[in-house]
């Protein structure tokens, strides 16, 4: 009995380590925006089978992309305080195990999307995987301080994937959702990079605060926040959304702008940390308001 219990605990621990490779908190936001994209794509209810299979498929491929990131950056992760507890730096899983895991999970996700959703969603998701795992992680991130701006395109794709899963096409409204996340990505990550600047410098990662300094980065956090605010007003301007969304977006935008102005004028690491955390709530809140407005329109 005791032997069985120990074996079960060891198995559960191993499963947990592989689960951590998928960066579940990051993937949960990806899946959330993808699901919102599904609901926004139709006036009524999303077919249950499409909702389930698309969600699972997108989550699997996103998790595989996160595992690629962990695999490629394991030496960097071992140095940085924020990431040294991940499974690969700790040695709780090996590189070959990670590769097999991500291949199986990613392959399963693509198969689900192709066979049970539609080929367009599968190809768009594969393109997103390549954009994040290869173009961003392997090429852009260690090469240019504009990694977040250029690589942000892959991170902005989830609502487009959700939209395509339900409709089989990509519309202008879907691309507007893409633009929101694309504009959100730089101020979100640069807030993190500001208070983690020394760690990024230590591992030679050319994040904007490392290459161009704090003041330049703080200015760009503010500028990109203003761009983000302009983009978030577009769903109302194009009549994609109504007054509920407009009111919610304005409230969320004002708070984000407050953080951006404070970061520019009176910077502290704690302020940047708070701004980074708020930016996650901001994006989730913005898409939640989009969903509410979609079904309750004024």
Curated annotation (Swiss-Prot):
GO CC field: plasma membrane
- EC assignment: 2.5.1.141
Q: Name one GO biological process term.
A: heme O biosynthetic process
Which pathway is recorded for this entry? Porphyrin-containing compound metabolism; heme O biosynthesis; heme O from protoheme: step 1/1
PROSITE patterns named among the record's database cross-references: UBIA (PS00943)
Tell me the domain of life: Bacteria
CDD domains, per database record = PT_UbiA_Cox10
Q: Which reaction does it catalyse?
A: heme b + (2E,6E)-farnesyl diphosphate + H2O = Fe(II)-heme o + diphosphate
Question: Is Cell inner membrane one of the keywords?
Answer: yes
Q: Tell me the compartments it is located in.
A: Cell inner membrane
Q: Which family does it belong to?
A: Belongs to the UbiA prenyltransferase family. Protoheme IX farnesyltransferase subfamily.
Q: What does this protein do?
A: Converts heme B (protoheme IX) to heme O by substitution of the vinyl group on carbon 2 of heme B porphyrin ring with a hydroxyethyl farnesyl side group.
Q: What is this protein called?
A: Protoheme IX farnesyltransferase
Instruction: Give the species.
Output: Nitrosospira multiformis (strain ATCC 25196 / NCIMB 11849 / C 71)
Report which gene this protein is encoded by.
ctaB
